[in-house]
């Protein structure tokens, strides 16, 4: 598994981008897109140090925002999504979404899991 990005909850993606720009230099930004499979609006930012932030707004993060939680998930890129899913689930992880294509990542497959340290997303390698 290789670190890919941090998922950030937000009510308004444009406002969150403006807030982030006050602290960090953004060197790359995707358009804000709607992913019907996740029922969320999404935008990927790359910061000057290479860190990727996925901004997520919509129903999927409403419960986190109500609790004033901004961090949503950590994403790892994996060679074999089914193999990693099986490994994590056999070590106390709980699958919380189906494996599905993600529009933001050119339809590479993703799956979300709950582990001891929070929510992780597995992203299939290119």
Predicted feature residues:
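Glyoxalase I/VOC metalloenzyme domain signal
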Residues: 1-4, 8-28, 46-96, 114-126
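Short acidic/glycine-enriched loop/turn segments that link adjacent beta-strands
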Residues: 36-41, 104-109
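Short active-site-proximal "capping" loops at secondary-structure junctions
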Residues: 34-37, 60
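Conserved catalytic-core motifs of GNAT/GCN5-like acyltransferases
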Residues: 28-35, 99-103
């Amino acid at each position: 598994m290789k670190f890919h990005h941090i998922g950030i909850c937000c009510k308004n993606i444009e406002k969150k981008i403006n807030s982030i720009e006050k602290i960090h230099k953004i060197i790359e930004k995707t358009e804000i897109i709607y992913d019907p499979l996740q029922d969320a609006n999404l935008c990927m930012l790359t910061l000057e140090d290479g860190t990727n932030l996925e901004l997520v707004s919509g129903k999927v993060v409403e419960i986190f925002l109500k609790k004033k939680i901004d961090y949503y998930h950590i994403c790892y890129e994996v060679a074999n999504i089914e193999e990693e899913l099986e490994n994590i689930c056999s070590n106390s992880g709980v699958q919380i979404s189906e494996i599905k294509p993600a529009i933001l990542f050119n339809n590479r497959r993703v799956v979300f899991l709950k582990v001891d340290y929070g929510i992780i997303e597995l992203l299939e390698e290119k």
